[in-house]
Amino acid sequence: AMALREMGYETIMVNCNPETVSTDYDTSDKLYFEPVCLEDVLQIYHKEKPAGVIVQFGGQTPLNIARALSDEGVKILGTSIDSIDIAEDRDLFRKMMDQLGIPMPESGMATNIDEALACVKQIGGYPVMIRPSFVLGGRGMEVIYDENMLREYVAKAVGVTPDRPLLIDRFLHNALECEADALSDGEHVYIPSVMEHVELAGVHSGDSACIIPPVTITKENLATIKDYTRKIAEALHVCGLMNMQYAIEDGKVFVLEANPRASRTVPLPQASTERAT
């Protein structure tokens, strides 16, 4: 908001959390204390008639309504809706990784026990990581070591539908997790740093600590991470910020996910490299 104001734009902030810095009275020209949901954002959009809406700086919530906003005629600035959809859809993103030759842990989706058993067999057996597809923050995630545990988990799962399946991934043993933030104008990609997690992969990144610069990641793995990040940003035609999450198992780098938005890690490389991302 401050950068846009310096460029001469009037800025409008939508945020219902009064504890955040973005709701300070001097951050934006106008501030709406409203839920970041389709109905409320549309009402503000029709009233203010802005040049466009930026969905990259509000965490996951704005991305969840980006497609619906676009369908209602809202102009989304930055990374395109189609690219956001690819990054958010596990099947589409995996197909892109296959095309780029970038490895991901074997995974699948299931809506019932038969599909779950078939998925585990396809992945290569136990242990597997299973979680609902419609929650954030690692809620409902569990490591499954045998068929009995799988049957018990699926039986207790609530709200599972074809649109909200269970996600099943191969469990990575003693894997190191790391992240990379990237900034792109659609052509050039800038990667300020790679962040190494203190905890092993599997601890939710919001509950873990990061180190900049990395301590135990090899130069070869660092080069691979930056190469993968650049290729993915270019393939998605990212215009703005992107956060990449990786896991390293036995010296091999696996992509976990791409977030086409600013992550909570953005201030870390900015502070450590003394360059604003």
Regions found by a protein language model. Give the residues of each.
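A short helix-to-beta-strand connector/capping loop
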Residues: 27-28, 72, 102-105
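Glycine-rich phosphate-binding loop
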Residues: 57
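Catalytic-core regions of core metabolic enzymes
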Residues: 31, 71, 82-83, 115, ...
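A conserved helix-loop-beta module that forms one wall/lid of the active-site cleft
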Residues: 79-141
